[in-house]
A protein has these predicted regions:
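Short, low-hydrophobicity acidic/polar segments
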Residues: 1-34
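Generic detection of short hydrophobic beta-strand segments and adjacent strand-loop junctions
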Residues: 15-19, 27-29, 79-84, 96, ...
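Residues at beta-strand starts and edge strands
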Residues: 23-25, 34-36, 54, 103-105, ...
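Intrinsic-disorder/low-complexity, polar/charged segments enriched in Ser/Thr/Lys/Arg/Asp/Glu/Gln
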Residues: 24-26, 37, 89-93
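A short, Gly/Thr-enriched small/hydrophobic beta-strand-prone motif that recurs across taxa
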Residues: 31-45
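N-terminal onset of structured domains
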Residues: 47-49
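Tryptophan-paired
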Residues: 51-130
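Hydrophilic extracytoplasmic domains
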Residues: 105-168
Length: 168
């Protein structure tokens, strides 16, 4: 099969209505997103000179490939996505869509020798970050993976944290 980098931004809406004979009718159909925007940034990973210069590879597996007419994600066919990276100063950025399913996906990073250097379950990340609301219509899951001298830290990028302090 073909390599999948992302799925399209998908929206679904339905509404029953009857158009009177020989009349016009205007109705609004509410749409809801079937997808989640993913933003994964990897910082601090420096390959040794002995390795090739090709970038890190992100693999996201156990992803559903379609939704039904009720906008429900199905687990009938699972796929692996290979998001494309945008190499920035000292970081790799992956932007892609997945269907609204968060139980099974696993993110894995591979170095240029195709050796797995990091993996994480998306469900575990979301459990640690309840501030990410995957139930809202337009959802983004921002993930920052930082390689440091003491190990790997996974967090939410600073730009994604909404520090709301309502004043009364």
């Amino acid at each position: 099969g073909d390599i999948i980098h992302s799925n399209d931004s998908l929206y679904q809406g339905s509404k029953e209505f009857a158009v009177p004979k020989n009349r016009e009718l205007t109705e609004t159909i509410p749409f809801s997103a079937s997808h989640i925007d993913m933003y994964v940034e990897v910082k601090g990973y420096i390959e040794t000179a002995a390795r090739s210069t090709s970038p890190l590879k992100l693999e996201v597996n156990n992803l559903s490939t379609w939704v039904n007419f009720n906008n429900e994600v199905t687990d009938d066919e699972l796929a692996t996505y290979y998001p494309l990276s945008d190499v920035k100063k000292q970081s790799y950025v992956y932007r892609f869509n997945i269907l609204k399913q968060t139980e099974h996906p696993c993110l894995k990073l591979y170095d240029s020798d195709n050796k797995e250097i990091f993996s994480m379950q998306l469900a575990d990340f979301l459990e640690k970050h309840p501030e990410i609301n995957i139930d809202k219509n337009e959802t983004i899951i921002p993930i920052l993976i930082e390689f440091k001298s003491i190990g790997v830290e996974v967090s939410i990028p600073d730009w994604a944290i909404e520090d709301v302090k309502p004043e009364f």
